[in-house]
């Protein structure tokens, strides 16, 4: 899904027989050339855009190896938690951000 000029979390489509966790690890390796460890699942979020509906399966992860190389994205940014809400997020990703900030003990503005 491409949302020009909007920030999105990395990820992609789940393949048949693949778990959401495995999908995320595979997609991050493909898109960013890094390996992550999945630590905590957040509640799935479904959003209806005018053209399609998407369900996101968010996870809290850490990078365990590699250096980020952008293979499919135009930009990447690493911010402190308290600055994440200042970005212009895609509509489907905003509830994921809110869930993450609640998990991390932050309030969203």
What is each residue range found by the language model?
Residues 1-30:
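Conserved Nudix-box catalytic region and its N-terminal flanking loop in Nudix hydrolases
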Residues 35, 44-67, 77, 100:
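Active-site-adjacent beta-strand/loop module that shapes the phosphate/pyrophosphate-binding cleft
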Residues 31-38:
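Short secondary-structure junctions
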Residues 20, 24-29, 41, 59, ...:
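Hydrophobic packing within well-folded, soluble alpha/beta domains
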Residues 69-109:
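Nudix hydrolase/Nudix homology domain
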Residues 14-15, 47-48, 83-85:
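Short histidine/acidic/glycine/proline-rich micro-motifs that form metal-
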């Amino acid at each position: 899904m491409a949302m020009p000029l909007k920030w999105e979390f990395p990820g992609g489509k789940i393949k048949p027989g693949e778990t959401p966790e495995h999908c995320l690890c595979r997609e991050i390796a493909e898109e960013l050339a890094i390996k992550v460890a999945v630590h905590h699942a957040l509640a799935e979020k479904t959003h209806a855009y005018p053209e399609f509906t998407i369900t996101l399966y968010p996870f809290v992860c850490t990078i365990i190896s590699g250096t980020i190389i952008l293979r499919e994205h135009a930009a990447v940014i690493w911010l402190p938690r308290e600055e994440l809400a200042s970005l212009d997020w895609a509509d489907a990703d905003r509830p994921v951000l809110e869930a993450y900030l609640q998990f991390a003990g932050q309030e969203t503005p």
